[in-house]
Amino acid sequence: MTSPSLVFENDKLILYQHELGEWDNLNHLIICKVTKHACIIDPFDGRFWYDFCQNKGVKLTHIWLTHTHWDHVKGVDELLELTDNQLTLKCHILEQERGYSSDKASWWTHGEFSQVAENFGALEFSIHCTPGHTPGHVTIIGNEVIVTGDCLFLGSCGRPDLFGGHKEKQRQSVLYLKNIFQTLSPNSIVLPGHYYQIDDGSIPKNSILSDFLKINKAINSAHDVKLWQELPFLSFDDNMAEQARRQRAKES
């Protein structure tokens, strides 16, 4: 297996990105330079990240989840087992609405379209509740880093037609984040949960914020309900959509 790519570094942190799994998941490991503590976001493979941290001589202390679809939590239990449950696992409590539970988790409880501060090592980030793809999806921002999970991809956004998703809340989350982005350095790095081809034919895995704001169709359509409704990536006629319809019917 290939090694993670060092995709961003400043005076406070080092950030590694790695593709894992058959769904092109992008995992992100943030290392605090001061304390040598590390936080893994949405781990797909627990053993992979445990071994990587051991080899790097850093202490993995935190797991943060942008949301709880299976491909974003697959490595959580293995990491907890490998570290004798010594990791801090954080997730938004609204993810319980789609059935996620863990007796090892600590829960963010702030409201939709709002933020709270969260620390690990000597680093502070803001955790923004951005529902739509799932009820308790969060976007992680701080220190020139933006981890969008499945709320926003580089050219599009996550689908809101799965169980627990909500198309209008997804639009509101995109508008909310667009306003937040206006306050950030244009050289901040945007890190999505998956990567797909964009209009110029390239398939980037990250982008600086200034470029991202130009190419992202969701960001540039969310202000207009009609344009938003016409976006082709908000819903799909596939097995996952059918499963979501059945789950909603079961819960109603």
Model-derived features with residue positions:
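Conserved beta-strand hairpin/beta-sheet module of binuclear metal-dependent hydrolase folds
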Residues: 3-56, 139-149
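Active-site metal-binding loops of divalent metal-dependent hydrolases
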Residues: 43-45, 68, 95, 132-134, ...
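Active-site-adjacent loop/tail segments of enzyme domains
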Residues: 157, 161-181
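Core dinuclear metal-dependent hydrolase active-site scaffold
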Residues: 28-29, 114-141
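Accessory terminal helices/loops
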Residues: 2-5, 172-252
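Active-site HxH/HxHxD metal-binding segment of metal-dependent hydrolases
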Residues: 24, 38, 44-124
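A short acidic, helix-capping loop that chelates divalent metal ions and anchors anionic groups
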Residues: 97-102, 155-163
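Histidine-centered catalytic micro-motifs
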Residues: 63-73, 128-136, 191-197
